[in-house]
């Protein structure tokens, strides 16, 4: 089983940090489906130390379980990242994850995210400053490198491990690929062979078969699932079950899915309030219903609704109609 410092994960299937997706309520939900670790949305370190409302909301954690209290920080200033890490530790975080992988132009333009892979000296300073600032484990998520000519993830992983970082996650693409092409799980094996700390494979893990293939090709200690959980938070438990038993675990029934969605919807509204919560919930509703009969009409209707009670009633009505059609 994977250990991050003194924290042992119950599963080697991890939920990836995703901006505007892995908020507190979504992490709670996926954790209930057996994720070994759930990671917060990326938080800008400078905004964190300024205690901006958005950053404080993003760093909210579940205090009863260390594997539910991992906060991801982004930035390019070692002292600022270190201060933000200490601040999160003081608020209860049990793991700090450093973002060296985000390919977004806005992030890279600020010399953060995957741009850090182009400056190994700066990366070293960030690793060392963060590890020194906190007593909790520090991990890092990166890509293979900036482009095909600079695939330096193995080198950066060695630097990270030497600096005291205790786990490395590698997305099997370069920054310049963004999300095009296929994730190169074979390359992750090179990273795994370069360090003794746990290495996690990430990228294109959307079903049972791909999860197994990613582990086999990468030799990684575990896998991190990202976009595959859109509308399927239960995928984490299905993958974990398949990797353990070799058998496929069926998805929840439509009735069970309705219960999951309603509880998730209620949690979003309670956490964010009505005016903010409904727009946030919409994207999840769209993903949940994707592929179901008449879902296009349902999604169009929900997109025009702002009253939280009406939206909830529409969800129930739609799923009941799907159940009736399946009788």
UniProtKB/Swiss-Prot annotation:
SUPFAM superfamilies listed in its UniProt record: FMN-linked oxidoreductases
Top-level taxon: Bacteria
Enzyme class: oxidoreductase
GO molecular function, one term: tRNA binding
Binding site for FMN: 17-19, 72, 141, 202-204, 226-227
Pfam families per the UniProt record, alphabetical: Dus
Entry annotation: catalytic residues: 102
Cysteines paired by S-S bonds: none
Keywords: Flavoprotein, FMN, NADP, Oxidoreductase, RNA-binding, tRNA processing, tRNA-binding
Named cofactor requirement(s): FMN
E.C. numbers: 1.3.1.-
Transmembrane intervals: none
Coiled coil stretches, renumbered: none
Catalytic activity reported: a 5,6-dihydrouridine in tRNA + NAD(+) = a uridine in tRNA + NADH + H(+); a 5,6-dihydrouridine in tRNA + NADP(+) = a uridine in tRNA + NADPH + H(+)
Database matches in CDD domains: DUS_like_FMN
Family: Belongs to the Dus family.
Function: Catalyzes the synthesis of 5,6-dihydrouridine (D), a modified base found in the D-loop of most tRNAs, via the reduction of the C5-C6 double bond in target uridines.
Cross-referenced NCBIfam families: nifR3_yhdG (TIGR00737)
Protein name: Probable tRNA-dihydrouridine synthase
